[in-house]
Each structure stands twice: as structure tokens, then as C-alpha cells.
């Protein structure tokens, strides 16, 4: 797929409409704010610390993960194709005094001048929103240095994930706007591993994340049956 075509305009428009609520801790992106500390800790611990390292956040949206990585000393570039979320991210970084370079571009196009440039690349909750996940994974691989880490997170495709993330989170609990997710675009761990195997990345770890609606708390779980993350490392 061409580097400038791996974009779904409907997905971009969906997140453009929600951009103004990105930093509302009780708004439509509340789940991401609750989830972010777990993601940040997993990335920082697995990569051996990101302080002083060059990090690319692919599909950064309004900058929740990007800002948290910058606050602990990473040199962060945020990449997204949504202009409204990027403007929100830039403004919030300015207001909070965090230095981040936000760029409107696809991973495939950004790769052209950033091959083996980053120590760490993150691609969280993004693969299920693009037409060609393999293309994004390859671009992430190409942009990380040998020995560097690439992190992916997405949602497993099964009955349980449909019930929890769409019926539960969107319709019953109203944690997310209806239509945020398309179950057909969810990616099974075996499928993601197969895509990773087509690159120079090696899967080092996989970890699930579960949500308790009674306590409102996310926590790690060894089960990857719904939300999950994988850590990969580029072969030297």
C-alpha cells in the first residue's frame, strides 16, 4: 500500500469530532487517561527507561501518552493524521510546558527521513483504525534503531471483546462514544504476531489489560483475550 493511502478518512473524521474533549479527564477519553499510567510504566520498564531517549508516538491523537513520556524525560515526536487532535495536543503541551514535536504525517511517509532514528516507537490503539496494519508495523520497524523497542496495543477479536468493548464500554457504560470501535477490525494476538514476524522485530513480551467497572480501575493481566500490548525489539 502506498505510504499516503494507508488512512481511513472515516476514522480520522471520527476522532476529529471528539478532539475538543481529549484532555477532559471525565470526558470521552476518560478510559485512555485511566489506562495511560499502566502503558507508560510498561513502556518505561520494558525499554530499560526512556529518559533521554528519542521516542516516536505513532497515532498520538491529542497527546496523552506523548506528554506522559516527555514528562519523564523522553525526547518525543508525536505523529498523527488528524489535524484537530494535533492542535489540541500542541496547545496542551504549550499550556503545561512540555516540549514535544507534533507532526501531521503517516508512519510510512515519516519513515523516509527517519530510518533507524528512534530508540523507542509506540503505536497504541492505532492498528485497528488503519486499512493496512502490516504497512504501519513495517514502518515502525524501519524507524527504530537496531536493538530498539517497538510497542503495539490493540484489541483481540472474539465474543468477549465484542461484549466488553462495544456492548459494555460503548452502549451500557457509555465510557466511549458509540461507533468508536469496529469489531471486524480488531486483531487477534496470533494475527499481530504473524504481522510482526514479517519484519525484523522480535516479540519479547505480551501483556493483557483488564478493566473492573465496579472499581473503575485498569490492571495488568496475563490474559490477552481483550485489550493487550506487545513489546517487540529490532534485531541487531
Swiss-Prot record:
Annotated EC: 2.1.1.222, 2.1.1.64
Catalytic function, reaction form: a 3-demethylubiquinol + S-adenosyl-L-methionine = a ubiquinol + S-adenosyl-L-homocysteine + H(+); a 3-(all-trans-polyprenyl)benzene-1,2-diol + S-adenosyl-L-methionine = a 2-methoxy-6-(all-trans-polyprenyl)phenol + S-adenosyl-L-homocysteine + H(+)
Name of a matching Pfam family: Methyltransf_23
GO BP: any one term: methylation
Keyword ATP-binding: no
GO molecular function: 2-polyprenyl-6-hydroxyphenol methylase activity; 3-demethylubiquinol 3-O-methyltransferase activity; polyprenyldihydroxybenzoate methyltransferase activity
Pathway: Cofactor biosynthesis; ubiquinone biosynthesis
SUPFAM superfamilies named in the record: S-adenosyl-L-methionine-dependent methyltransferases
Keywords associated with the record: Methyltransferase, S-adenosyl-L-methionine, Transferase, Ubiquinone biosynthesis
Principal EC category: transferase
Gene3D superfamilies assigned to the protein according to its UniProt record, in alphabetical order: Vaccinia Virus protein VP39
TM region(s), chain numbering: none
Positions contributing to S-adenosyl-L-methionine binding: 39, 59, 80, 124
Domain of life: Bacteria
Function: O-methyltransferase that catalyzes the 2 O-methylation steps in the ubiquinone biosynthetic pathway.
HAMAP family: UbiG
Family of this protein: Belongs to the methyltransferase superfamily. UbiG/COQ3 family.
Name of this protein: Ubiquinone biosynthesis O-methyltransferase
Lineage: Bacteria, Pseudomonadati, Pseudomonadota, Gammaproteobacteria, Alteromonadales
Gene that specifies this protein: ubiG
Amino acid at each position: 500500500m502506498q505510504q499516503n493511502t494507508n488512512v481511513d478518512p472515516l476514522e480520522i473524521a471520527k476522532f476529529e469530532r471528539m478532539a475538543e474533549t481529549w484532555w477532559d479527564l471525565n470526558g470521552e477519553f476518560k478510559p485512555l487517561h485511566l489506562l495511560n499510567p499502566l502503558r507508560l510504566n510498561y513502556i518505561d520498564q520494558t525499554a530499560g527507561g526512556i529518559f533521554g531517549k528519542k521516542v516516536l508516538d505513532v497515532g498520538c491523537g491529542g497527546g496523552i501518552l506523548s506528554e506522559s513520556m516527555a514528562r519523564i524525560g523522553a525526547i518525543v515526536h508525536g505523529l498523527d493524521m488528524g489535524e484537530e487532535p494535533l492542535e489540541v495536543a500542541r496547545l496542551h503541551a504549550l499550556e503545561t510546558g512540555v516540549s514535544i514535536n507534533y507532526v501531521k504525517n503517516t508512519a510510512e511517509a515519516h519513515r523516509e527521513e527517519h530510518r533507524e532514528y528512534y530508540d523507542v516507537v509506540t503505536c497504541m490503539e492505532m492498528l485497528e483504525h488503519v486499512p493496512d496494519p502490516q504497512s504501519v508495523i513495517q514502518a515502525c520497524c524501519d524507524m527504530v534503531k537496531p536493538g530498539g523497542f517497538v510497542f503495539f496495543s490493540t484489541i483481540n477479536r472474539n465474543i468477549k471483546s465484542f461484549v466488553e468493548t462495544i456492548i459494555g464500554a460503548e452502549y451500557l457504560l457509555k465510557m466511549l462514544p458509540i461507533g468508536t470501535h469496529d469489531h471486524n477490525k480488531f486483531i487477534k494476538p496470533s494475527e499481530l504476531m504473524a504481522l510482526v514476524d514479517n519484519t525484523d522485530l522480535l516479540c519479547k513480551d505480551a501483556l493483557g489489560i483488564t478493566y473492573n467497572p465496579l472499581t473503575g480501575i485498569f490492571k495488568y493481566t496475563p490474559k490477552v483475550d481483550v485489550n493487550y500490548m506487545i513489546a517487540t525489539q529490532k534485531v541487531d
